[in-house]
Amino acid sequence: MTRHHQPRKGSVAFSPRKRVARETPRVSTWPELDEAGLLAFAGYKVGMTHVTALDSRKGSPTENMELSVPVTILEAPPLVVLGIRAYTKTTYGLKTLTDVIANDNLDDELSRKISVPKFDDIEAKIEELRNKIDDIDEIRVLIHTKPKLTSVPKKKPEVLEFGLGGKSVEDKLEYAISILGKEITPQDVFQEGEYTDAIATTKGKGVQGPVKRFGVRIQYGKAARSGIERHVGSIGPWTPNRTMWTVAMQGQMGYHKRTEYNKKLLKIGDESEVDLINPDGGFVKYGFVKNNYILVKGSLPGPSKRLVVLRKGVRNASKQVTAPEISYISTTSKQGV
């Protein structure tokens, strides 16, 4: 039998492991869909609970049986489309061509985040945008959140850029014009049973040693008797006489942007159904859900109160959308769990 060799568990694909510069996640990849519409939505992480749902997976040993499924709850108040952004392709990538910012129906707290123009002729700017359609290669929308409607103790909204679906640039532009200055709910973007990608900033854990950070083995034998166990036994060879950047060492752990693929949406509820999920005393370190909410199967990155972006899946072409049958949602108190 061969000797098991496992010098490390941490992947160098995530280097450098440093704190993210911006807690609000930035989406760099968008799926290409023919149907006009938003490709993402954002919500605040509330906490976790469990539901009892029917297993609809064909060929599963538990097919058509009820299972206890862990779920994460996101509070998803309406998002406001504050602007349209047009891009043109250059040799250096996409470059912003022009922006059109709405001047009505925007949150009063938006001025805490950006400088909002007050007297813009929107119709003239939209017509100018239509005249530049030959120079436009990509259309996206700017949206802002409404955290003051939730139990998150903040008023300043986040501003994000979301991609659009559509067969052509003209279709994307007309759809963006139709929703400019309007509120968007999660029901307008997703449907129950759909697979999405969750993008968020993970929990920060500060500076940690190589054992916790990379999963290296704790020293044993003579090395352990020296009194120092939680360190790397060798950080490199005699030649080349330098330390490689791939060597597991202590450093920042957590507070990184991460993407988790194919997270299934089990339920999308509105504000009239919050009693179905709110436990006695509210959720730990969050409070009560007051708005639209989304139940996502499994766990999501980040602590409670952190913004999570749900993007339409980029790897789920073969997955069918079937609304799950939920018979029970646990509302037992989460205090002390």
Curated annotation (Swiss-Prot):
Region (Disordered): 1-26
Gene Ontology biological process: translation
GO MF annotation: an example: structural constituent of ribosome
This protein's GO CC annotations: cytosolic large ribosomal subunit
Domain of life: Archaea
Residue ranges the record marks as coiled coil: none
Keyword set, alphabetical order: Ribonucleoprotein, Ribosomal protein, RNA-binding, rRNA-binding
Pfam families linked: Ribosomal_L3 (PF00297)
Gene3D superfamilies associated with the record: 3.30.1430.10, Ribosomal protein L3, domain 3 (4.10.960.10), Translation factors (2.40.30.10)
Family membership noted in the UniProt record: Belongs to the universal ribosomal protein uL3 family.
Quaternary structure note: Part of the 50S ribosomal subunit. Forms a cluster with proteins L14 and L24e.
Function: One of the primary rRNA binding proteins, it binds directly near the 3'-end of the 23S rRNA, where it nucleates assembly of the 50S subunit.
Name of the protein in its database record: Large ribosomal subunit protein uL3
Organism for this UniProt entry: Methanosphaera stadtmanae (strain ATCC 43021 / DSM 3091 / JCM 11832 / MCB-3)
Gene: rpl3
